[in-house]
């Protein structure tokens, strides 16, 4: 296997909290998939959840080599967790098409957060 894309993003959680305080749920509705939205509404720490999802979606867009533009949207990336809690990245729409065009056969994602920051790294392999 060869790495064909790598993206990392770090988010200051207080920044996301400020956006949520100013604009309510608009950011969450814009970046989360339907499944993630349901999880966000039930989450014990919704701002932290949102910050981690924002970071992973930015990291994934960077791994694809584009960022969020040229037809890519935040809701085309979705994070689910396996039975052990490991994050799994799913791609839809233009994001999935671009990954296929690049020849990606495997996606790896890791998320981490501390008191002030959330970060994510995404690797695409073929």
Curated annotation (Swiss-Prot):
Superkingdom of origin organism: Bacteria
UniProt-listed Gene3D superfamilies: 4'-phosphopantetheinyl transferase domain
Pfam families per record: ACPS
Cofactor(s) required, per the database record: Mg(2+)
Catalytic activity: apo-[ACP] + CoA = holo-[ACP] + adenosine 3',5'-bisphosphate + H(+)
Chief location category: cytoplasm
GO molecular function annotations of the record: holo-[acyl-carrier-protein] synthase activity; magnesium ion binding
Compartments (UniProt record): Cytoplasm
Gene Ontology cellular component list: cytoplasm
Keywords: Cytoplasm, Fatty acid biosynthesis, Fatty acid metabolism, Lipid biosynthesis, Lipid metabolism, Magnesium, Metal-binding, Transferase
One annotated GO biological process: fatty acid biosynthetic process
Family designation: Belongs to the P-Pant transferase superfamily. AcpS family.
Protein name: Holo-[acyl-carrier-protein] synthase
Designated gene of the protein: acpS
